[in-house]
Amino acid sequence: MSKVTEITHPLILHKLAFIRDKNTGSKDFRELVSEVSMLMAYEVTRNLPMEEIEIETPVCKTKCKVLAGKKVAIVPILRAGLGMVDGMLQLIPAAKVGHIGLYRDEETLQPVEYFCKLPQDIAERDIIVVDPMLATGGSATDAITLLKKRGAKQIRLMCLISSPEGIEFVQKAHPDVDIYVACIDEKLNDHGYIVPGLGDAGDRLFGTK
């Protein structure tokens, strides 16, 4: 079974409180989501493979550790996942960015794919799938399935807030994918929204309804 890591750093929890607040406007919401994503990226990348190289300082030659040959790709689930990309690129500027477009059918609550654009070397990269909310788990599960069909092998999932149901759903479908969240909330309501959650992340990011 995959590992679930709840990243409860004080700065993350502080910013998450304002992300949840319904009175936080789109501008501040976007900035906070980006900041929390950057902070979470530190933990999500903790186990990236490393290798030793030799460099020369102004004093002498020495050996240092750097990221190994495999590189990172960030794959946001559109559209809300876009809000997490810039923050992550602050820490991983060389990462490539793919895009998977899924929307949730309001009646069935199931994800529907409408767009997919990935780096050509996706099979050679460590993949971090990002989406602010892990609610039913359907979108994340479908995105991961799509990535595996394209050859991706090393995949992590990073979300700001999740429901217990969403985590369980992803774990059953993809027991090899580790999940990183800032907070695991209480439950899903009858409309498939996380409680207490933060509302619709995409609408709050982009000022739409």
UniProtKB/Swiss-Prot annotation:
First-tier enzyme category under EC: transferase
Required cofactor(s): Mg(2+)
Catalytic activity line of the entry: UMP + diphosphate = 5-phospho-alpha-D-ribose 1-diphosphate + uracil
Binding positions (5-phospho-alpha-D-ribose 1-diphosphate): R79, R104, D131, P132, M133, L134, A135, T136, G137, G138, S139, D200
Alphabetized UniProt keyword annotations: Allosteric enzyme, Glycosyltransferase, GTP-binding, Magnesium, Nucleotide-binding, Transferase
Listed Gene3D superfamilies: 3.40.50.2020
The organism's place on the tree of life at top rank: Bacteria
Single GO term (MF): GTP binding
GO biological process: UMP salvage; uracil salvage
Positions bound to uracil: I194, G199, D200, A201
Annotated InterPro entries: PRibTrfase_dom, PRTase-like, Upp_B, UPRTase/APRTase, Ura_phspho_trans
Inhibition and activation profile: Allosterically activated by GTP.
Similarity-based family: Belongs to the UPRTase family.
Protein name (Swiss-Prot/TrEMBL): Uracil phosphoribosyltransferase
Species of provenance: Clostridium perfringens (strain SM101 / Type A)
Organism lineage: Bacteria, Bacillati, Bacillota, Clostridia, Eubacteriales
